[in-house]
Amino acid sequence: MAHVKELSAESLLELKNIEGLRINTDLRERHLYESDMGELPSMPKRLVGKTTPAAIVQPQNENEVIQVVAWANKYSVPIIPRAAASSGYGGVVPVPGSVVMELVHFNKIIHMDTDKKTVTVEPGIVWKDLEFKLNAAGLAVRMMPTSAPASTVGGWLAQGGGAGFGSYQYGLFEQNVESATVITPDGSKITLAAKDLSLVSGAMGTTGIITSITLRLRALEKHTAFGIEAKTPAQVQEILEQIDLKGLPLWHAGFMNPTAARLKNRVPPKTHHGHPLPKPVLPESYILLLACDESRAASVEKKLAPIVKDAGAVMLPQDITEHEWEDRFNPMKIKRIGPSLVPAEVIVPLNRIAEVFEQMEETVKPPVLVEATMVSSKHIVLLCLIPHDARKLTFNLAFTLSLSILKLAKRYGGRAYASGLYLAQEANQVHRTRISQWLNFKREKDAKNLFNPRKLSGIPLMKMMIGTALAFEPMVRIMGNRIKPQLRENWKAKNGLPGDVVWYAYSCARCGYCRNVCELYGGKGWESTSPRGKWAYLRRVAEGREKFDQEMTNNFLKCTTCERCDFTCQLDLPIEPSWAVMRGELVNSGKQMTFPAFELMAASAGKEKNIWANFAEKRDEWVPEDLRPKIKDKAEIAYFPGCTASFVEKDIAAASARLLDAAGVEFTYLGKDEACCGIPMLVAGRWDVFEKIMRHNIRKMKEHGVKTVIASCPACWLTWHTYYPQWAKKLGIEYDFEAKHYSEVISEKLARGEMKFTHPVNMKLTFHDSCHIGRAGGIYEPPRDMLKAIPGVELVEMEHNRENGLCCGSVLTRISEPDPLSNKLGRMKLEEVAACGADACVALCPCCQFQMRVSADANGMDIPVKDLAAVAAKGLGIELPDYTPYVLEMWAVFDKVITLMQVPNMAKLMTLLIPRMMDALPAPLRGMMKMAKVPGLDRMMARMMPPMMPLLMPILMPKVMPDMLREVEKMIEMPDFMKKQMPDLMPKTMENMLPHVLPEIAVLVTPAMIQYVKTKQLPSIRIF
């Protein structure tokens, strides 16, 4: 591996001593901070050189920023300010030995003035999040970038440019900023008024780190969009000029070229669990998209119609207009068929736009997608994207066409839209007199040039190369024009990664839309935990620069499977399904292990068909005795309660069955023959166990004559609805079951008047949308319809609900580690419950309820969590016990099991077994171990034992297992059913787990083993 410049031990220690500062020096993590969303070809990338930072810091307040700046000045360490890294100009690319200052925790609203219509925010707040919060107060931003789902307020000001949605009415972003607070390179804090913003606007953090910004706002009003189809660029120009001449009060005006429409039509459709979703076919013409305030729509429409007609254009169908308006934040969709893009972004006069497009078509032969945004009535920004493949050498040639577009824009009075590391030679034309202002300021305040070096001056060799390419552009263009992109997905496996995963990794736009909604990233806060970071890591694996180990495998396993990323990805990449593929590739293949607790669950599922280490014979004990005679031996409808509702939260199963009975639904039930649905094994990567479970359940349902399976658990519903059919098709198993959730059945009965709640439940309730039935299934309204039908219930909504609902934070995340991240994610969810003023949170998922109850207890939050079916049963006059105490009791056991199964604690457990292991060794080895008493030979034994232990353990484990079980029983107070099963479950768990962890355990146990040989004494051991 190439040398990476590190911080000195002294400077690193001092940095770590800054109280509250989050620091990451993990090399793998640092690699993920080497770039922004821009993608350079191999040749100019060499000129940029190494870009691995020495550390990443995440300050959480101004004081920490000031302390880091003082530290950087003391040790002459460059600082690279970074927010969302959603630009492509190289503005956040580090230099060797630098520290990236990531401002993701500066994401709050500081003050909102509804009278003056202003808001002061921290720089790391994401535009879409800000707009969401402002809308709740009756306000809205004046404008936002096309990257609003990920980009930040501070990033837009620092990068410059500032053209986006709303620019037609309000101009550039800087013109809508009232003030900004900045920490300068000497550590001073200054506040810049609007007239002084030139010091930081467009300076890319070279003159200071923005810590707050005050924006001017507008009153909230919905926008009405209009779509127009034009055949020629001349028509586009005429329409836009007439709109200006006639004074149409537009908020936004923009368009795409015919190539953009054609390529968008070629992009694979968005899929939902493998099923393609419909999308309209765009006319392969110039498509104009205009928007105005809703109150002005009638007037605008009246004036617009003759303009469109006189230009020879036509209005777009409403469905296409609405689709494109909803899709307006997704300009990079065509990267899906690239999988790379050659970008060029220029600003040109409107009155030359027809000439620019006519010449572009003549000049650049590969397809060029253009998304245009009007800055005002006089200028327009053109985002030009040429699809290609960065893995190919010819990408270097194709990239030169971006210079052809730049030169073309200049010919017609335009310029580059922005500068940065990659276009530093354009800085004087883009920023004009500001360059000298910035350089003078830096000479005074940043003599060491520590704040984001190279972003103003650029890289001399790169500037020379680009200058030469511009000088010889006609010749260079000839070579670039010979390149023909393939414009389709092409899946090829690479370095052990499946072909589709490799393609998606390169397709990823690195825009960060997924990062902003990722539950895991929201809890952890480092790039490697985000989908964007995972795609970047997979690219490195494909290129042979990284190899999967257990730590990174765990990173993929920890995904909460909430699917929020799938709903926000602008390329419609199947992100969560791809992580599911990787779980199989990593775990089911045997290369890595799943989380240890899941091995215990797998052993339990294999033996007793459930994940709770309980006995199958107890599975149906939840059934109310008066209902037993009503449950049919055979029926076309079956109720499938699942493991958690059967063994832990039994009120869910009992209430669900009573609701079905009250609704007149005749059903059968597998009873003791029911197995876990298998989804825990599927998401844990134990596909072998999942397949066995699936085959069992399908066979048993067929034996009972079932055609429709009704589930109460969303995960069980998802399994029967989606995963079983997919796997059955793959395995050639006949599958003709329909899957429903009980809320669908009951809401239908209520709507038809076939069922009615009779008893009031006087509570203000809010409903939690479970991911596995909400985003994964689109079932949002039936549960709400049930609650609304109960007398006395007042239903209130949380800030995030339905498709945007927050995950409870469970699934593998809770099982993955002691002091789990799930408690933090659960707190985030419960804070929303408290904020909406509800008396309790209602959920329909057993696992969500379990997670929220445990999180409430861990965070000291007195927020009741109620089951939907139990609340509904109360509406029928049926009272059921609250199982929260039993939930906490069971979690206390599993929490200790999870803690015990961590490698350091497993090593401690093994240490306690050293005397028995020594006795169990073959006689020759026992004799050899005694050599450790000989001076000097103990060091030899210390080297020998770690590689020997994995070889010896298969011999030793059966002999020491009884002792291990006794030690575990001493440490963990288990319920009787679990204690009785441990002699069967623990050996199987160890069999699957130890081969992966023994090398680490051996290193930790060896010193204690040598000590025991010498002294017959063990070190003091404490786990709990």
Question: What spans do the regions from the language model cover?
Answer:
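Iron-sulfur-cluster electron-transfer modules
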Residues: V502-A505, W535-A728, E734, K749, ...
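N-terminal flexible segment immediately upstream of the FAD-binding catalytic core
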Residues: M1-A70, S87-K117, R262-V267, H272, ...
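FAD-binding subdomain of flavoenzyme oxidoreductases
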Residues: K108-M112, V119-F255, F451
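Cofactor-cradling patches in redox/metallo enzymes
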Residues: D572, T644-F737, H772-A789, E794-M901
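Ferredoxin-type iron-sulfur electron-transfer modules in oxidoreductases and energy-metabolism complexes
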Residues: I478-A505, Y521-E608, K692, H696, ...
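Activity-critical C-terminal alpha-helical subdomain
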Residues: Y422-R488
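C-terminal substrate-recognition/cap domain of FAD-linked oxidoreductases
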Residues: N24-T25, E29-S42, Q237-S404, L408, ...
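A glycine- and small-aliphatic-rich helix-loop capping segment at beta-alpha/alpha-beta transitions
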Residues: G91-N107, N135-L139, G161-E174, I213-L220, ...
